[in-house]
Design a protein with these regions (language model features):
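Short gly/ser-rich loop at a beta-strand->alpha-helix junction or flexible surface loop bordering the NTP-binding
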Residues: 1-156
Length: 156
């Protein structure tokens, strides 16, 4: 398949996920690694936001796109928590929204990177809120995690 070949379902997936897609999703659609590399080359039409996560546009991603990228990077069942989750629940936090905090199961083999801070937990919430493809913890968990983060990040 040429690197510029049209991939069935790609446009719909990008539309559903704020122009953010994972390598695994692209492979499932039939895209080869060489085609992905061609798209994210210097001056190319896409960019790599995180390891294995691509942004199908040029320019800086907005918060929704960063959140989508964070969830794709963190893997299935992951949930956004902390200040970003509070924002989606309509609560404001004094924390700058530069980092997406994500809960992941304890066995997940990923490290925090870029704008994503992963938090492994034995207590993954069974209930959560969805907004399109994004998944967030409930308000009480978001508040508790934000307080914990503020305590951990406070200068000593």
């Amino acid at each position: 398949m040429p690197v510029t070949a049209r991939i069935d379902g790609l446009g719909e997936l990008l539309d559903q996920q704020f122009s953010v897609v994972s390598r695994g999703q692209l492979l499932a659609l039939g895209m080869k690694d060489t085609a992905m590399q061609w798209r994210v080359r210097a001056g190319g039409p896409w960019q790599a936001l995180l390891p294995g996560v691509y942004f199908g546009l040029t320019g800086a991603p907005n918060l929704l796109q960063q959140e989508m990228a964070a969830l794709l990077y963190a893997g299935p069942g992951s949930l956004i928590t902390g200040p970003m989750a509070l924002m989606h629940h309509g609560l404001r936090s004094q924390v700058m929204l530069e980092t997406v905090d994500v809960l992941v199961p304890p066995g997940r083999q990923r490290l925090s990177t870029g704008f994503v801070r992963l938090h492994r937990t034995q207590r993954m919430p069974s209930r959560f809120v969805s907004s399109g493809p994004l998944r967030f913890v409930l308000e009480a968990r978001a508040v508790a995690d934000t307080v914990r983060l503020l305590t951990e990040l406070r200068p000593k």
